[in-house]
Amino acid sequence: MLMNTAEYLSIIENIKSEITVAQYRAAIHVNADMLLLYYDIGCVINEHKSWGNKFIDNLAADIRIAFPESKGYSVRNLKYMAKFAEIYPDREFVQQVVAQIPWGHNIVLLDKVADMDERKWYIKKSAENGWSRNVLVHQIESNLYQRQVLADKVTNFDHRLPSPQSELAVQTMKDPYVFDFIPFREDMLERDIEQALVRDVTKLLLELGTGFAFLGNQYHLNVGGDDFYIDLLFYNLNLRCYVVIELKTGDFKPEYAGQLNFYLSAVDGILKKEQDNPSIGLLLCKSKNNVVAEYSLKDISKPIGVSEYKITSSLPDDLEKQLPSIEDIQKRIK
C-alpha cells in the first residue's frame, strides 16, 4: 500500500505536531528546572552576604572541583544568581513567569531593565515571539516598551473599532517607530524611505510586531476607473484585518487623514472579505502635533492611528543573523 493517502498524510502531520509540542515542553521544563536551581543557589548566597565576596569565590572554586564538566557556575554567574533571587523574591513567580525565557535572556533583563512591569512585559514578548538574546537587547535599547506601552498614542480606534479589536490595535501600535536599518540622508523622499523599508522587509516586520504579513508596496487599487497606489499594504493575522500604511517625510497635516480614510474605504470595498475585521490605517510622519492630529481624526469615519518615525542607522551588524526569516515569521503567525 502506498502511504500517500490523505488519511496517512494527516496522521503524519498530527504526529509531527505532537513531537514538536513535546520537544518544546521538554525544553521549557529543562529551562525551568535550571532557573529554579539558579534561584535557590542565589537565595543561599544572599542568606550568607555577611561572609563577604570570598564566599562566592570559594563556592565557585568548590563547585568547579566537584563538577568539572559543568558550566555556568563562575563567580560572575553566581553573582547574577544572587541578583536574580534578590529581584524575584517569589519562587512561584520565577517558575511560572520568568522560566519562560532562557538564563541568558534573564541576564540581559537584570542588566538593562530596572522596572518590574517593564521586565515582565519583555519576558512575555520574548516568549511569545521567540526573540533571540540579541534581538531582545535591540528591542530594549530601542525603548520598545516605552514606545509600545507607555506612549501617548493618537488614534480613533476606541470610537471606530469594536472591542476587543480596538484594544489590540492600540497595543500593537508604537510611537515612534524606529527604522534603524535605513541609511539616513537629510534629503530622503517618501519613496526613498519606502523602498528602503521594502528592501529590508524582515527587519520592517520585526519593528511592526507579531502578526504582520507584507502584501506589497505601491499597491494598486482601481476605483471607478481611476488608479491609486497605497504606500505599504499588510495583513495582520492577530487583528484579522488589512493594515494600510502611508509614509510622510514632513510634519503631519490634516489632509493626510482624509487621504488615508479614502484608501481604507477602497480596501474595505475591494479587498476585505466577510470574515475580515475593518481595515486599519497607520499614518507615519516625521513629526506631529498631537492636538492637531487628534482633531483631524475626530470625525474621520475609518480607524486611523498617527505615529512618528525615526531613522537612526544604528542596527548592530551582528543582529542580521539573529533576525527570523520571512518564512519563520509566517510560520510563527499562522
Where are the regions that the model predicts?
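Basic, low-complexity intrinsically disordered segments
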Residues: M1-K334
